[in-house]
Amino acid sequence: MPAYDNTSSVSGGDQTVCVTGAGGFIASWLVKLLLERGYTVRGTVRNPEDPKNGHLKELEGARERLTLHKVDLLDLQSIQSVVHGCHGVFHTASPVTDNPDEMLEPAVNGTKNVIIASAEAKVRRVVFTSSIGTVYMDPNTSRDVVVDESYWSDLEHCKNTKNWYCYGKTVAEQSAWDIAKENQVDLVVVNPVVVLGPLLQPTINASTIHILKYLNGAAKTYVNATQSYVHVKDVALAHLLVYETNSASGRYICCETALHRGEVVEILAKYFPEYPLPTKCSDEKNPRVKPYKFSNQKLKDLGLEFTPVKQCLYDTVRSLQEKGHLPIPPMQEDSA
């Protein structure tokens, strides 16, 4: 964890913050780190009594400084009651789907309500979890240039390719900036790439599924595509950094490195050779596609040191095993 300069930053102490969608993959880690730093946390969830949120109650400091609240983000009054009295808000809740009906209204109107409630509560800062999908989805974005926070996805291109997730996230982030400006809210945005690492929650998150499919034999080949990855703890830490650093502003791409899917399975095979990992690409005619080059300099300048991608992959598999989502081969059990 980077060293904090207390003259230019805030810290937990007597601060109360709200985390929306607290039971999610990134949000669970964020709640964990916030509690460790002494914050009092109000987490919004669909159902506080749902067993899938039970892991939050077991976090260190949760008994004393964590409360879970049933909130419908499409109901402004619902979120107002939780945000009132908070010093800051972390808006991480968002649907992950390619269904436009399920994506657009929750992503856009939910975000709008959170920012309006934050303005009324006069919170110090709102940190919004966006996505790399709001940055690079543009046919004119070259894989030969370094893509930084000034890039935006093209909405028409997202529509034409029916990438409703990127469309919804882009509309949501753009509207977040507009609403924040209208209401004079200090908004900072984190744009993570594909997030890997240990699961705190009992359920599998969307970003881990392709790793699981490589390991359990569901995927017989790998596609000719690249993916950029980052460790979940680094994403949570990025949220903390941009909240606590007074000078933080704008967008922050959160990315460690990019790998071709072939490189992913090669790394997995090195660490976990017992699994039936694919060895062939589904496209053997064309050369391997080049990855996008994303800049992570803004977060590095704040002091974030990224976890190497090999560690991300290793931690992900170990977590899938520990949570019972991936059987441990007998050979590995014997050597454990």
UniProtKB/Swiss-Prot annotation:
User: Keyword Ribosomal protein: yes or no?
Assistant: no
Could you tell me which cysteines form disulfide bridges?
A: 158-166
| Known EC number | 1.2.1.44, 1.2.1.-
What's in the keyword line of the UniProt record? Cytoplasm, Disulfide bond, NADP, Oxidoreductase
Name one matching Pfam family: Epimerase
- Modification note: The formation of a reversible disulfide bond reduces activity by perturbing the positioning of nearby catalytic residues.
* Cell compartment(s), UniProt: Cytoplasm
The protein's superkingdom reads Eukaryota
User: In Gene Ontology terms, what is a biological process of this protein?
Assistant: phenylpropanoid biosynthetic process
Its UniProt pathway annotation is: Aromatic compound metabolism; phenylpropanoid biosynthesis
Cellular component aspect of the GO annotation: cytoplasm
Task: Tell me which tissues or organs this protein is expressed in.
Answer: Mainly expressed in roots and stems, especially at the second internode and, to a lower extent, in leaves and flowers. Localized in vascular elements, with weaker expression in the interfascicular (xylem fiber) region.
Q: At which positions is NADP(+) bound? A: 21-27, 46, 52, 72-73, 92-94, 165, 169, 192-195, 207
Write down the chemical reaction(s) this protein catalyses: (E)-coniferaldehyde + NADP(+) + CoA = (E)-feruloyl-CoA + NADPH + H(+); (E)-4-coumaraldehyde + NADP(+) + CoA = (E)-4-coumaroyl-CoA + NADPH + H(+); (E)-sinapaldehyde + NADP(+) + CoA = (E)-sinapoyl-CoA + NADPH + H(+); (E)-cinnamaldehyde + NADP(+) + CoA = (E)-cinnamoyl-CoA + NADPH + H(+)
Note whether Disulfide bond occurs among the keywords.
yes
State any single GO MF term: cinnamoyl-CoA reductase activity
Catalytic residues (positions)? 169 (proton donor)
| Function per UniProt | Involved in the latter stages of lignin biosynthesis. Catalyzes one of the last steps of monolignol biosynthesis, the conversion of cinnamoyl-CoAs into their corresponding cinnamaldehydes. Mediates the conversion of caffeoyl-CoA and coumaroyl-CoA to caffaldehyde and coumaraldehyde, respectively. Also active, with a lower efficiency, toward feruloyl-CoA and sinapoyl-CoA. Involved in the production of floral volatile phenylpropanoids in flowers of fragrant cultivars from cinnamic acid, a common precursor with the anthocyanin biosynthesis pathway involved in flower pigmentation.
Instruction: Identify its protein family.
Output: Belongs to the NAD(P)-dependent epimerase/dehydratase family. Dihydroflavonol-4-reductase subfamily.
In Swiss-Prot or TrEMBL terms, this protein is called Cinnamoyl-CoA reductase 2
- Provenance organism: Medicago truncatula
Q: What is the lineage of its organism?
A: Eukaryota, Viridiplantae, Streptophyta, Embryophyta, Tracheophyta
- In the UniProt record, the gene name given for this protein reads CCR2
